[in-house]
């Protein structure tokens, strides 16, 4: 009985943590954030390393990054308009999102990969101390 109670308690805690994480993810405007680490850069800036995983066509709110972002494809396919034209990226490739480039939301002519396509990406971005690495545009 002790083992069942402990397992049940762990399951409830896991569900609550998952729900809290999902709620934060919804507030932040990104889909699929599964981990995020922040590293101090000489006390003046922070380096964010974030892993995302999602299936289907990504829907992110319109936003920009005050400091540029590097996105690395761990697995799957994604597309970016960062070069000025839609480009498709797959496992092992990467792209750079320039500082202050507004993107996300309903992008015209966005490449579609379908509901069965899953992807994992690693986003690496910096920000000045006290500033958010991502700013959402209303």
Please place each PLM-identified region on the residue numbering.
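Short acidic-glycine-tyrosine-enriched beta hairpin
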Residues: 54, 83-102
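A short beta-loop-beta micro-motif enriched in histidine and acidic residues
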Residues: 57-69
